Amino acid sequence: YIRKKHNVLIGERTAEQLKISIGCVYERTEEDKKIRPESVEIRGRSLVSGLPKTLTITADEMFEAFEEPAYSIVDAVKAVLEKTPPELVGDISEKGIVMTGGGSLVWGLDRLIACETGIHCEVADDTISCVAIGTGKSLDMLDILMDGSARNKYYKQ
């Protein structure tokens, strides 16, 4: 996005800094704007001159940059819900969706998913560690998981 819109090349660390500090995928309220910064100054290399260049990137620009990938995530959630057995969808609808992993920390993703699916969505406590802990538990029970998936008609589709 930064390269296309501003003709400036930035590194992964700078992109991560932008994502964490002002990245958002849902329209921010006035209250939200008081909590999070409106803009961040970054440095990169101009693709025109090859020289260092400083830019001020706004939260609105990040909203624009994240729009397409955010809706891809929403579409994936909807696709999973469409393939989920009805009784399980009922439970999910009642109890909500709990997001884990670093991507769940992108500001407003929980609100966007809730708005688009009509299902309450929240970010897990200690969301980064949840992924590692869950992966470890899954590996401990791999034989059970493989046996269950081999017999599950929904898994084979």
What are these regions (language model features)?
Residues 37, 94-95, 118:
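Active-site lining segments that contact anionic ligands and/or coordinate catalytic metals
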Residues 111-137, 145, 152:
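Conserved phosphate-binding/catalytic loops in two-lobed NTP-binding clefts
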Residues 1-67:
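Phosphate-binding glycine-rich/basic clefts of nucleotide- and phosphate-handling proteins
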Residues 23, 89-113:
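Glycine-rich phosphate-binding loops at beta-strand->alpha-helix junctions
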Residues 8-16, 137-157:
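Acidic, glycine/GT-rich loop-and beta-edge segments that sit at the periphery of enzyme/chaperone cores
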Residues 6-12, 28, 81-89, 145-149:
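Active-site phosphate-binding and catalytic loops of NTP-dependent enzymes
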Residues 65-92, 138-141:
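Phosphate/ATP-binding catalytic cores across multiple sugar-kinase/actin-like superfamilies
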Residues 18, 77, 99, 135:
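Residue-level signature of catalytic and energy-coupling elements of molecular machines
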